[in-house]
């Protein structure tokens, strides 16, 4: 290879890679400068990269209000923005029902704990972690045409799709949850994802897990099962019709 030179690096840290991003100027249609806003950055990291294994740190400003009439004080500190360790990567022995319920209510914006959860880890032809929930109540738009089924799909802790409909059959469209697989590419398109063999295997396994969980509820906890059925029975009666 011709046309290159090697020289001493004056980087103070000495190691690692620095990536500098430059934003385009704002236009009438696009306000790129919003991506420099502290809360916007925090929100994007929380949504897409909350569960990657490495810390994402940023200098964060906090405003402290003192006595009335005095100027507020602004303090800056380097903070880690992401959680790093997702609940579905933890061992079941480390977790209580309260942990599962709190995650569900925070993640999916529900004020009521789910009827049941399914925490599974699969290795082999398709390697993945899954945490599924059977809600105690239907979303307000569940029986409307606007409702979109799907599970949150992650690749090594990075969310690649917020609602992957191909992971759930229509008769289990009420199930909420996350699936995380290292076998899926981060930049896979929606079209290729629909044809992905790994995804089809995962979907088949999840359907079986949901069936088994509902059968277990029916046998061991009739009260919970009847609560579930009273909410979602219209789905099955309409399908039968």
Segments (PLM) and residue ranges:
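GHKL-type ATPase core
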Residues: 1-70, 77-80, 155
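Short acidic (Asp/Glu) and glycine-rich catalytic loops that position anionic groups and cofactors
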Residues: 16-26, 78-84, 148-156, 180-189, ...
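Hydrophobic/aromatic-rich, well-ordered segments within soluble, folded domains that form packed cores
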Residues: 36-53, 165-187
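GHKL/Histidine-kinase-like ATPase module
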Residues: 39, 68-177
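A glycine-rich phosphate-binding loop feature that marks nucleotide/adenosyl-phosphate handling sites
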Residues: 61-65, 120-124, 191-196, 227-232
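Charged, alpha-helical coiled-coil and linker scaffolds that mediate dimerization/oligomerization
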Residues: 167-174, 181, 208, 212, ...
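Extended, well-ordered alpha-helical scaffold/bundle regions in very large, multi-domain proteins
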Residues: 186-220
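Conserved small/polar residues in nucleotide/adenosyl-binding loops
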Residues: 236-241
